């Protein structure tokens, strides 16, 4: 029958969506002829659009189907990055009407009971995942880890305090440059001269005796360098940017004064920044600290001082729930180790056709940079991989080559397909 003002389109979760009545016969309108099919009728010709529901499931990291009629790619992007398909499907099912509330999460008041239940559960699940002690606060903020490069010294230092930095890549270097505006900085080790391919021996670090804290980037996304253990500050406390390996493995939170990171690599979409901070470190911000960078303001207001990134926090909550359902971070780490071993072994077994410049002992489980012996073939490698539905393999513009980011949500099947492609490519071009 033709759609009228009393007609409804029925979604895959039986949600009724009112169909609009055209203002005149010259405008396009809708006919519902077959189940799940919408005919767009105009003066020219009808166009039928078939809406296909899918029950795609991912078991043991392997896809059992595709969403709708459009097969998904394997997305190796460094961030924003691939998200778990079951999380996306949950969000899709609730997008129009969240749990019978009559509204989308994107429409909720951040001070309403519905969103309060979302953010409180997200924090609770994250605390369970990382076994966060009660003497730590969890903040859901905005601005990315880059904003925290300023927020950290503003909240934790006086202008004449010194902060030590171990710089193992581009992000650690950026953190130093920003901190210089608000405190004294001392780079006690930098891997820049060796093109950021290693982590130093902690015994050789000459720390500043009265340093307020020691800052590291736990996993350098661009260069693929990851701390497998952490230095112990002689004075002060340890602060870590964990943007690209957050929730990829268990972490002893009590070893840190602050852990922070952007969500868009491992635990959600872009727009959410998570800060885990020891409570006794809150409340000492410099007078010049903007209100939106003051940890005390956000802590006292439970991350609701202003409108937070509501939908992003909701998505993070779904990811935390998913990680718990997988068995927690010990199980997640096992899966990540298996994927990384598969890819690194393929590189090592290529007899130099593929090369990873990073020292083996500190190679990242999350970001795998590699180059070709014949660099002139790299563009073709990226192009041909895209044809096989493996995308975002181009290395960061500052280093070139290729990079495969294999975060939690990258299924084993994606890495297996990439390794098979690498072997075929080598056979054709060796």
UniProtKB/Swiss-Prot annotation:
Function: Involved in the plastidial phosphorylated pathway of serine biosynthesis (PPSB). Catalyzes the reversible conversion of 3-phosphohydroxypyruvate to phosphoserine.
Coiled-coil region: none
Top EC class, one word: transferase
SUPFAM superfamilies, per the entry: PLP-dependent transferases (SSF53383)
InterPro entries recorded: Aminotrans_V_dom, Aminotrans_V_PyrdxlP_BS, Pser_aminoTfrase, PyrdxlP-dep_Trfase, PyrdxlP-dep_Trfase_major, PyrdxlP-dep_Trfase_small
Regulation: Inhibited by high concentration of cysteine and by 3-phosphonooxypyruvate. Not inhibited by serine, threonine, valine, glycine, tryptophan and O-acetyl-L-serine.
PANTHER family (UniProt xref): PHOSPHOSERINE AMINOTRANSFERASE, PHOSPHOSERINE AMINOTRANSFERASE 1, CHLOROPLASTIC
Similarity remark: Belongs to the class-V pyridoxal-phosphate-dependent aminotransferase family. SerC subfamily.
Keyword Ribosomal protein listed: no
UniProt induction comment: Up-regulated upon necrotrophic pathogen infection.
Catalyzed reaction equations: O-phospho-L-serine + 2-oxoglutarate = 3-phosphooxypyruvate + L-glutamate; 4-(phosphooxy)-L-threonine + 2-oxoglutarate = (R)-3-hydroxy-2-oxo-4-phosphooxybutanoate + L-glutamate
Known tissue expression: Ubiquitous, but expressed preferentially in light-grown roots and shoots. Detected in root meristems and in root tissues surrounding the vascular bundle.
Self-association state and partner proteins as the record states: Homodimer.
Positions contributing to L-glutamate binding: 111
Binding note for cofactor: Binds 1 pyridoxal phosphate per subunit.
CDD domains, A to Z: PSAT_like
Pfam families recorded: Aminotran_5
Modification N6-(pyridoxal phosphate)lysine, positions: 265
Record-listed N-acetylvaline modification sites: 52
Annotated signal sequence range: none
Annotated metabolic or biological route of this protein: Amino-acid biosynthesis; L-serine biosynthesis; L-serine from 3-phospho-D-glycerate: step 2/3; Cofactor biosynthesis; pyridoxine 5'-phosphate biosynthesis; pyridoxine 5'-phosphate from D-erythrose 4-phosphate: step 3/5
Transit peptide interval: 1-51
EC numbers on record: 2.6.1.52
Record protein name field: Phosphoserine aminotransferase 1, chloroplastic
Record's subcellular location: Plastid, Chloroplast
Positions with a binding annotation for pyridoxal 5'-phosphate: 145-146, 171, 221, 241, 264, 306-307
């Amino acid at each position: 029958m033709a759609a009228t003002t009393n007609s409804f389109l029925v979604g895959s979760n039986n949600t009724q969506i009112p169909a609009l009545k055209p203002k005149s016969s010259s405008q396009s309108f809708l006919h519902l002829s077959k189940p799940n099919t919408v005919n767009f009728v105009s003066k020219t010709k009808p166009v039928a659009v078939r809406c296909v529901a899918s029950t795609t499931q991912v078991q043991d990291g392997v896809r059992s189907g595709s969403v709708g009629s459009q097969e998904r790619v394997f997305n190796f992007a460094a961030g924003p990055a691939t998200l778990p398909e079951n999380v996306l499907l949950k969000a899709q099912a609730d997008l129009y009407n969240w749990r019978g509330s009559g509204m989308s999460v994107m429409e909720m008041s951040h001070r309403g009971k519905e969103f309060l239940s979302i953010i409180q559960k997200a924090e609770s699940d994250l605390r369970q995942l990382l076994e966060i002690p009660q003497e730590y606060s969890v903040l859901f903020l905005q601005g990315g880890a880059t904003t925290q490069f300023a927020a950290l010294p503003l909240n934790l230092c006086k202008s004449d305090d010194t902060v030590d930095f171990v710089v193992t890549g581009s992000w650690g270097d950026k953190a130093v440059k920003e901190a210089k505006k608000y405190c004294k900085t001392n780079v006690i080790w930098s891997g820049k001269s060796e093109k950021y391919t290693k982590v130093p021996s902690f015994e050789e670090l000459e720390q500043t005796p009265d340093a307020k804290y020691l800052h590291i980037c736990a996993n350098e996304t661009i260069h693929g360098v990851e701390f497998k253990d952490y230095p112990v500050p002689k004075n002060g406390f340890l602060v870590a940017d964990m943007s690209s390996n957050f929730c990829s493995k268990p972490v002893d939170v009590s070893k840190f004064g602050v852990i922070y990171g952007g969500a868009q690599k491992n635990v959600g979409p872009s727009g959410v920044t998570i800060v885990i901070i020891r409570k006794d470190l809150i409340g000492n911000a410099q007078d010049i600290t903007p209100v939106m960078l003051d940890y005390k303001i956000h802590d006292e207001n439970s991350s609701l001082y202003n409108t937070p990134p509501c939908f992003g926090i909701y998505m993070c909550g779904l990811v935390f729930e998913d990680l718990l359902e997988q068995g927690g971070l010990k199980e997640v780490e096992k899966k990540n180790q298996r994927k990384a071993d598969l890819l690194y072994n393929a590189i090592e077994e290529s007899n130099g056709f593929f090369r990873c410049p990073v020292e083996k002992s500190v190679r990242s489980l999350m970001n795998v940079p590699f180059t070709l012996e014949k660099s002139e073939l790299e563009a073709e490698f990226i192009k041909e991989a895209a044809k096989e539905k493996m995308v975002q393999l181009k290395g960061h513009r500052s280093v070139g080559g290729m990079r495969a980011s294999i975060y939690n949500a990258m299924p084993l099947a994606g890495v297996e397909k990439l390794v098979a492609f690498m072997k075929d490519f080598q056979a054709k071009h060796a």
